[in-house]
UniProtKB/Swiss-Prot annotation:
GO terms for molecular function: pyridoxine 5'-phosphate synthase activity. 3-amino-2-oxopropyl phosphate binds at N9, R20, G194, G215, H216. Its EC number is 2.6.99.2. Catalyzes the complicated ring closure reaction between the two acyclic compounds 1-deoxy-D-xylulose-5-phosphate (DXP) and 3-amino-2-oxopropyl phosphate (1-amino-acetone-3-phosphate or AAP) to form pyridoxine 5'-phosphate (PNP) and inorganic phosphate. Coiled coil: none annotated. Belongs to the PNP synthase family. This is Pyridoxine 5'-phosphate synthase. The record marks E153 as: Transition state stabilizer. It is found in: Cytoplasm. The keyword Magnesium does not apply. Pathway: Cofactor biosynthesis; pyridoxine 5'-phosphate biosynthesis; pyridoxine 5'-phosphate from D-erythrose 4-phosphate: step 5/5. The gene is pdxJ. GO terms for cellular component: cytosol. GO terms for biological process: pyridoxine biosynthetic process.
Length: 247
């Protein structure tokens, strides 16, 4: 049985901090607590408008994170420069729109393969492992392979937000098909977006997925039971469901 890794997105800790313009709660301290609680990695999105995570946060996180740091970022010159200076373990290129509450969908790579190839090359030359956040779509996977990344993160948002069983099954089949196609290229597969304690089960049972990125659900539960307990609960679910896939 392959272990399913869990990375915690701590953007939402920073959102609470910035709502009142205080210095607390500190997402850097949250990362420390998360690692002490068994998390496998820390994910942060440094947005162009710095609405939650700040430059100060990412600099300190790079110094203190002992597992892996995954920097989500837009494909801009500014972010590439910051990433090359910071040298996180991973960078995940994501789409970014100023008015969105959270990332609304995956990258559309079809007409920007050359641009993405150049960005991936710069990041790779800096020693950073690069992934692309894409929808579960065959053409996007083909484009990812052409761009030259070794890892993709499949957007589980439509699956997670499905309003009925039929739609959820349809989206799940798309994810399954996309995983099979990505594996034919030898790509490593992560997944995330919108996953919570109720809908994560069937995604966790897909044994080809290496890591899940989950933030809002864990931080929300932590408000009531604490971050260590919220992480423990999610990790136990992932372990239980991954075992069921092997039975």
């Amino acid at each position: 049985m392959s272990n399913l890794l869990l990375a915690l997105n701590i953007d939402h800790i920073a959102t609470v901090r910035n709502a009142r313009g205080t210095q607390y709660p500190d997402p850097v301290y949250a990362a420390y607590i998360a690692e002490q609680s068994g998390i496998d990695g820390i994910t942060v999105h440094l947005r162009e408008d710095r609405r939650h995570i700040t430059d100060r946060d990412v600099k300190l996180l790079r110094e203190i994170v002992q597992t892996t740091m995954n920097l989500e970022m837009a494909a801009t010159d500014e972010m590439v420069m910051i990433a090359c200076q910071l040298k996180p373990h991973y960078c995940c290129l994501v789409p970014e729109r100023r008015r969105e509450l959270t990332t609304e969908g995956g990258l559309d790579l079809i007409y920007q393969i050359d641009k993405m190839q150049n960005i991936v090359l710069k990041l790779s030359d800096a020693g950073i492992r690069v992934s692309l956040f894409i929808d579960p779509d065959i053409e996007q996977i083909d484009a990812s392979y052409k761009i030259g990344v070794r890892c993709i993160e499949l957007n589980t948002g439509k699956y997670a937000e499905s309003k009925n069983k039929e739609d959820r099954i349809l989206e799940y089949r798309r994810i399954e098909k996309s995983i099979k196609h990505a594996l034919s290229y030898g790509l490593m597969i992560n997944a995330g977006h919108g996953l919570n304690y109720d809908n994560v089960k069937f995604i966790a049972m897909l044994s080809q997925i290496r890591e899940l990125n989950i933030g809002h659900a864990i931080v929300s539960r932590a408000v009531f039971c604490g971050l260590p307990k919220a992480i423990k609960d999610m990790k136990e679910l992932l372990k239980e469901f991954r075992k069921k896939d092997d039975q």
